[in-house]
Amino acid sequence: MNHETFLKRAVTLACEGVNAGIGGPFGAVIVKDGAIIAEGQNNVTTSNDPTAHAEVTAIRKACKVLGAYQLDDCILYTSCEPCPMCLGAIYWARPKAVFYAAEHTDAAEAGFDDSFIYKEIDKPAEERTIPFYQVTLTEHLSPFQAWRNFANKKEY
């Protein structure tokens, strides 16, 4: 498998997205058995969706194509090292590998600096820039109990 070919496609998608004005400079492709099954471009600004990063967009499309919520035996190629949000999505999707071209420091130099998010993760919830507050309810564990008791659940 020629990883460079798929990475070049991801970079091309990123450039096309910029030139079309659909979002930030990021592109991604997902490959299974040597063939591209899904492509994604960042379209945050045109969709008004802050989660519409190239990797997430590609993952959503690939899962629809496969009719599955995990990307077993797939490889994700992305134009840039994934941000923390995309990293989480990638781990949930479980591809067998990820290849990227540019580093997150390259993205930071272009105005896409996500280093603050990594710093926020290590802080106690109440000390984050956007404070998080837990409010316990008597029924706060009931969704998890319902999940444990649900006979037809698909574990993931």
Swiss-Prot record:
Pfam families: dCMP_cyt_deam_1. Induction: Expressed only during limited or partially limited nitrogen conditions. Can be induced to high levels in the presence of purines or intermediates of the purine catabolic pathway. Expression seems indirectly controlled by TnrA and GlnR. Its EC number is 3.5.4.3. Its cofactor is Zn(2+). Signal peptide: none annotated. InterPro entries: APOBEC/CMP_deaminase_Zn-bd (IPR016192), CMP_dCMP_dom (IPR002125), Cytidine_deaminase-like (IPR016193). It is an enzyme of class 3 (hydrolase). Pathway: Purine metabolism; guanine degradation; xanthine from guanine: step 1/1. The keyword Chloroplast does not apply. The keyword Zinc applies. The active site is at 55 (proton donor). Keywords: Hydrolase, Metal-binding, Purine metabolism, Zinc. Zn(2+) binds at residues 53, 83, 86. Residues 1-132 form the CMP/dCMP-type deaminase domain. It catalyses: guanine + H2O + H(+) = xanthine + NH4(+). Catalyzes the hydrolytic deamination of guanine, producing xanthine and ammonia. PANTHER family: CMP_DCMP-TYPE DEAMINASE DOMAIN-CONTAINING PROTEIN, CYTOSINE DEAMINASE FAMILY MEMBER. This is Guanine deaminase. It comes from Bacillus subtilis (strain 168). The gene is guaD.
